[in-house]
Amino acid sequence: MTPDDLLEEFRAAGALLEGHFILSSGLHSAVFLQKMAIFSDPVRTARVCAGLASVIRDRYGAVDLVVSPAIGGIVPGYETARALGARAIFVERDPGGPFQLRRGFSIPAGSRAVMVEDIVTTGLSSRECLAALRDQPGEVVGAACLIDRSGGRADLGAPLVALATLDIPNYPADQLPPDLAAIPAVKPGSRATTPG
């Protein structure tokens, strides 16, 4: 699957939105990628995650385990793991707390794991997920996502490979361009923020 194929999947699912959006990072953007429109379709999800699995194999080789941040990363993590023939686990947190492995999940010694995200904007969730894995006996070889909307600038503290890399401008609330400021903001994402 090429980056253009992935974007066509988003368009066909009605998941590539234009307007004024407050992202889960708190930044504002004229473009929102409504990934749940993709993940609500099992066939489409399998297709895009098989594409990501191919990119992971090319970059990192064989992996035994896919680790994703809850909640948004669970579906793409699971489906990517399935395409890789790997196990899928996830990190989760108490509200306001750090991510941690629970439910008996671990990265055993001798295993190779990759952290899989859906969409990376600032890389905050990815960095927090990777931090939760630092003390595990197995090796975390890197990270992967369907779309890196930072244009490759997000620093995760680990290698990142994306099925598509886009350079979509994002703005702090006090630095909006006039055309974006003229449109009422909506918050379609998942992380609680205060509009501003």
Curated annotation (Swiss-Prot):
Give the required cofactors: Mg(2+)
Q: In which pathway does it act?
A: Pyrimidine metabolism; UMP biosynthesis via de novo pathway; UMP from orotate: step 1/2
Q: Which residues bind 5-phospho-alpha-D-ribose 1-diphosphate?
A: E117, D118, I119, V120, T121, T122, G123, L124, S125
Q: Which GO terms describe its biological process?
A: 'de novo' UMP biosynthetic process; pyrimidine nucleobase biosynthetic process
- Entry EC no(s): 2.4.2.10
Enzyme class (EC, first level): transferase
Q: Which reaction does it catalyse?
A: orotidine 5'-phosphate + diphosphate = orotate + 5-phospho-alpha-D-ribose 1-diphosphate
What would be one Pfam family of this protein? Pribosyltran
User: What would you give as a GO molecular function for this chain, any one?
Assistant: magnesium ion binding
Keyword annotations for this protein, in alphabetical order, are: Glycosyltransferase, Magnesium, Pyrimidine biosynthesis, Transferase
Q: Where along the chain is orotate bound?
A: T121, R149
What job does this protein perform?
A: Catalyzes the transfer of a ribosyl phosphate group from 5-phosphoribose 1-diphosphate to orotate, leading to the formation of orotidine monophosphate (OMP).
Q: Which HAMAP family match?
A: PyrE (MF_01208)
**Subunit-level organization:** Homodimer.
Q: What family is it from? A: Belongs to the purine/pyrimidine phosphoribosyltransferase family. PyrE subfamily.
What is the protein name given in its UniProt record? Orotate phosphoribosyltransferase
Which species is this record about? Methylobacterium sp. (strain 4-46)
Gene of this entry: pyrE
